[in-house]
Amino acid sequence: MAEEGITAGGVMDVNTALQEVLKTALIHDGLARGIREAAKALDKRQAHLCVLASNCDEPMYVKLVEALCAEHQINLIKVDDNKKLGEWVGLCKIDREGKPRKVVGCSCVVVKDYGKESQAKDVIEEYFKCKK
């Protein structure tokens, strides 16, 4: 699970950093969304980071993604909710007030290209260094 309370230098927790990284990667066309795109990116070793929803309703998806990440030594983060993950990676409509609506759940996302160097990327990388 992506712990919420972890702060790197008291600046940004892992969930906030993850949202920033996903947003930047989305802008730079560096995301593979959904199990098919994600599995292809993982298999081709194009992935820097994989994000998996804990509430994925298909256990074989989870096994496949976890196995591919383990096989190719790709960092894996789990988030609580597939709707939240779908919102973070742009699988929704934004209404006039800027609030997301018609959010589509997304069980798996792979970051193929971070887009640019950022503090959020450093926080995520530091998180994985601490986990090892």
Curated annotation (Swiss-Prot):
GO molecular function: structural constituent of ribosome
Stretches assigned to coiled coil: none
Claim: Ribonucleoprotein is one of the keywords in the record: yes
Database matches in Gene3D superfamilies: 3.30.1330.30
A biological process term (GO) from this entry: positive regulation of canonical Wnt signaling pathway
Family: Belongs to the eukaryotic ribosomal protein eS12 family.
Protein's job: Part of the small subunit (SSU) processome, first precursor of the small eukaryotic ribosomal subunit. During the assembly of the SSU processome in the nucleolus, many ribosome biogenesis factors, an RNA chaperone and ribosomal proteins associate with the nascent pre-rRNA and work in concert to generate RNA folding, modifications, rearrangements and cleavage as well as targeted degradation of pre-ribosomal RNA by the RNA exosome. Subunit of the 40S ribosomal complex.
UniProt cross-references to PANTHER family, sorted A to Z: 40S RIBOSOMAL PROTEIN S12
Descriptive protein name: Small ribosomal subunit protein eS12
Organism: Gallus gallus
Classification of source organism: Eukaryota, Metazoa, Chordata, Craniata, Vertebrata
Gene that encodes the chain: RPS12
